[in-house]
Amino acid sequence: MSSKNFHKYRKMQDKFDLPQLNELKRTFKFDLEENEKIFDQIRNEISERIFTFTEKIIEPVIAGSDSYSCIFEQEMLSDKERQKLFDIYKKIQVLKWENNLLMLQPDEKKAAEWVKKTWELWNNEIEGELSKVCRKLSNSWDTLKFMSEHNNYNG
């Protein structure tokens, strides 16, 4: 990353109380390209990962899908756990549409605010809750047993 981009981020970091760039890169596993607008690139990298979680983890569990696993996974979570996931889902959808608006109408200040808001939501809610769900589903699959019922027709 160019020193120009780094200094630009540092300036915005101080102004908007943004997370350390290295923390963002490590958490969301991305590298920055030299010639890109730094906030657009950071926003795009973060949004790609968060929205992937939505599509691969949250949506199938709360809404179902055509996959065989969803039939079981929906039953592995309680109504309360599914409601928590839906509440997170709504917050991520807000981020998604704010992100879409920033793609249509780029604004560096709003992009910086979006990064901060997303970072806080990730650390305060998303990561912890999704980790719990992943652990629970993994454990549930590990202990899942088919019940064999033999129905005898006595008619």
Task: For each feature predicted by the language model, list its residue ranges.
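Long, low-complexity or tandemly repetitive, helically biased scaffold regions used
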Residues: 2-155
